[in-house]
């Protein structure tokens, strides 16, 4: 049987991700799925600029929590959480469209990051 219990400090991170997902990511997902203003008109370049700035702010909040690129091991600048903790975090983010992008763990970047880190050169 797999033990899914985690230490209290990590549970606080899971709880933060759950709140962040509900309060920030789900509304963004809803907006992005429509991609229009309240009056039904399509978004213009200025609107997308506002969205990009908002997403940058959300990414910074994730980084401030130490959860950016949480799938990476410590040798690549990540926390090296292990499979159970990865599963618990991905369970929360997998319910959203934009969550993985905001946490720096979206496909195909997750696999590519490791490949470049292990096989890339300075060039």
What is each of the regions a protein language model found here?
Residues 1-106, 118:
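Amphipathic, small/basic residue-rich leader segments at the start of a protein or domain
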Residues 106-113:
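Short, conserved phosphate-binding/catalytic loop or strand-edge motifs used
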Residues 120-123:
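Short, intrinsically disordered, charge-balanced linker/junction segments flanking boundaries
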